């Protein structure tokens, strides 16, 4: 079914709340590999969320990036992450891909993306190279790709992927490529403890021939800020949802045992709730800063710090949950066990110490007192 939204009538957060029970209800089976996330993606489409990241001009609301739809984007990712972090991860990649196609695609490419997404197509961004990094060269009628991607999320679910590739001059280019050829996908390498339901793995692009319109933007546009590192607030919003899910599960378990009134257990719940709210404020403010129409490259620092703040909140909350519930939360089938595995895996990032160091240097170079870093002219 092809959808188009009425921007002034569509409530993305309400739509996320509507589908959340279905996503949560299927999460355990998806983690065990008994079902795929196909039904979840269809639910997102029928609720209007798949086309929501499209610009208003294309039948969406610009969810997560257009003014007026950024705060809603934070809450949508948070609600989805609370229901099933694997689904939220795929949706975040979809939002990122739609935004990149809108930022850098030709008019023809944007129209193609809009048609596909309104029809329910899930998009993704695949940036991690495999043993043979993806390269591109020009052919007579377009470009030809070679090499492969790893950690490609949503194999069998993603229809169009934004893929990074190195051109003959050593620059990174973005390419919009079809991703639904099962012969090119290989999930066998995805032997991980968390985020198993994302159907990730390797994707071989060798010999893939595409029109020149498949190129998005110019050389190294992929790394332009605040759209590159600045976009990590979306990861953090999804992760925050999982932290909230852990906190809710702790409260439910303690209440069932009649232990929520115990002063030590109540304090653990309160500390977890405080961590959630602190993280939420970090993410919301980072999103509004980065996605502002006049955002400068330096605003990406706030998003990096928000992601690190969420990682700290996650670590602190997992400690509180472990102390509150003990061994019960480590039994297979307990909601906390699965959510913790997914969250712990998703939190992993390359060189977090380097990210913190770079952010600290950027902060130190700012003028004015600490409390005015983000508000001073």
Each language-model region and where it sits:
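Glycine-rich flavin
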Residues: 36-46, 50-153, 157
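Glycine-rich phosphate/cofactor-binding loops in nucleotide/flavin-utilizing enzymes
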Residues: 328-377
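Glycine-rich beta->alpha junctions and the first turn(s) of the following alpha-helix
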Residues: 192-277
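Register-specific recognition of a single heptad position within extended alpha-helical repeats
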Residues: 3, 7-10, 227, 234, ...
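C-terminal helix-coil-helix/basic helical segment that borders enzyme active sites and/or dimer interfaces
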Residues: 24-32, 255, 278-309, 319-330
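Generic structural signal for well-ordered, non-transmembrane alpha-helical segments
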Residues: 241, 270-277, 304, 308-315, ...
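A short core secondary-structure module
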Residues: 151-185
């Amino acid at each position: 079914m092809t959808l188009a939204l009425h921007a002034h009538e569509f409530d993305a957060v309400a739509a996320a709340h509507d589908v959340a029970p279905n996503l949560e209800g299927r999460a355990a089976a998806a983690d065990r590999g008994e079902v795929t996330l196909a039904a979840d993606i269809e639910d997102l489409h029928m609720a209007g969320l798949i086309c929501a990241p499209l610009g208003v001009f294309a039948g969406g609301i610009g969810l997560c990036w257009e003014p007026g739809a950024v705060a809603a984007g934070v809450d949508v990712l948070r609600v989805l992450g609370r229901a099933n972090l694997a689904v939220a991860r795929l949706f975040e990649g979809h939002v990122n891909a739609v935004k990149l196609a809108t930022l850098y695609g030709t008019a023809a490419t944007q129209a193609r993306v809009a048609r596909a997404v309104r029809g329910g197509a899930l998009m993704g961004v695949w940036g991690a190279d495999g043993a043979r990094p993806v390269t591109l060269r020009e052919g007579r009628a377009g470009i030809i790709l070679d090499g492969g991607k790893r950690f490609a999320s949503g194999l069998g679910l993603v229809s169009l992927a934004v893929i990074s590739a190195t051109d003959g001059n050593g620059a990174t280019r973005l390419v919009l490529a079809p991703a639904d050829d099962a012969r090119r996908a290989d999930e066998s390498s995805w032997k991980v403890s968390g985020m198993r339901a994302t159907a990730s793995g390797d994707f071989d692009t060798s010999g893939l021939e595409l029109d020149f319109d498949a190129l998005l933007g110019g050389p190294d546009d992929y790394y332009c800020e605040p759209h590159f590192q600045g976009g990590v607030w979306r990861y953090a919003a999804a992760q925050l949802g999982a932290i909230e899910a852990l906190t809710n599960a702790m409260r439910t378990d303690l209440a069932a045992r009649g232990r929520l009134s115990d002063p030590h257990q109540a304090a653990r719940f309160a500390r977890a709730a405080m961590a959630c709210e602190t993280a939420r404020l970090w993410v919301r403010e980072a999103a509004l800063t980065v996605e502002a129409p006049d955002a400068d490259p330096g605003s990406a620092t706030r998003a990096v710090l928000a992601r690190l703040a969420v990682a700290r909140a996650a670590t602190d909350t997992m400690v509180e949950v472990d102390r509150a519930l003990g061994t019960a939360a480590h039994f297979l089938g307990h909601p906390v066990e699965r959510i913790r595995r997914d969250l712990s895996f998703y939190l992993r990032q390359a060189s977090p110490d380097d990210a913190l160091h770079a952010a600290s240097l950027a902060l130190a170079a700012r003028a004015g007192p600490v409390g005015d870093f983000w508000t001073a002219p």
